[in-house]
Curated annotation (Swiss-Prot):
This is Acireductone dioxygenase. GO terms for molecular function: acireductone dioxygenase (Ni2+-requiring) activity; acireductone dioxygenase [iron(II)-requiring] activity; iron ion binding; nickel cation binding. Keywords: Amino-acid biosynthesis, Dioxygenase, Iron, Metal-binding, Methionine biosynthesis, Nickel, Oxidoreductase. The record marks R111 as: Important to generate the dianion. It comes from the Bacteria. The gene is mtnD.
Length: 186
């Protein structure tokens, strides 16, 4: 079940302890409304197609061709790819670490979860919005939004990624260690 937890971005007593969340909700409409208030898109779509365990990027994109075409058309996205992570993926640790530090993008970060789950943490103003996305969730993080992503130590997900450029995923890391203080997908 998708979940949103909203925290202040700083501890209460200066001891580095995680502050208590201001909000925790599992209701998709509430998640959508809270994120929309901060200009983040969130939708739930049916992920109606089951993928074979050995599905490659071409198979995944073909299976979800109508959804891909709609998102590309509506958002003007030039490029789309599919990322699929499994608990035995040989690069899982390196890829997890790559996304765990706070960063921004010059373009929107748009992801549709076809399988599994991932944890997006968005650092907006004085809040951190920890958003658990699961199968059927589409999240659109606006360009310039400070955030990080956790796939967990034993990742199991497939997501379609949409880009406004031909280079794909390009990040600018902030150097802020804030991500170390917030919940991960463990």
């Amino acid at each position: 079940m998708s979940r949103l937890s909203i925290f202040p971005d700083h501890g209460d007593g200066g001891d580095g302890a995680l502050p208590l969340p201001k909000l925790v909700c599992n209701d998709p409409a509430s998640i959508q409304a809270e994120l929309a208030d901060r200009c983040v898109g969130f939708e739930q779509w049916p992920a109606a197609h089951a993928l074979p365990p050995d599905a490659d990027q071409s198979t995944i994109l073909t299976t979800y061709a109508s959804e891909v075409a709609r998102v590309q058309r509506d958002g003007g996205y030039q490029t789309v790819d599919a990322i699929r992570m499994t608990p035995d993926h040989p690069e899982r640790e390196a890829l997890r670490n790559k996304f765990l530090s706070e960063h921004t993008h010059a373009e929107d970060e748009v992801r549709f979860f076809v399988e599994g789950q991932g944890l997006f943490s968005l650092h907006i103003d004085k809040e951190v919005l920890v958003t658990l996305c699961e199968r059927g969730d589409l999240i659109s993080v606006p360009a310039g939004t400070r955030h990080w992503f956790d796939m967990g130590p034993t990742p199991s997900f497939c997501a379609l990624r949409f880009f406004n450029n031909s280079e794909g995923w390009v990040a600018t890391f902030t150097g802020d260690s804030i991500a170390e203080r917030f919940p991960r997908l463990d």
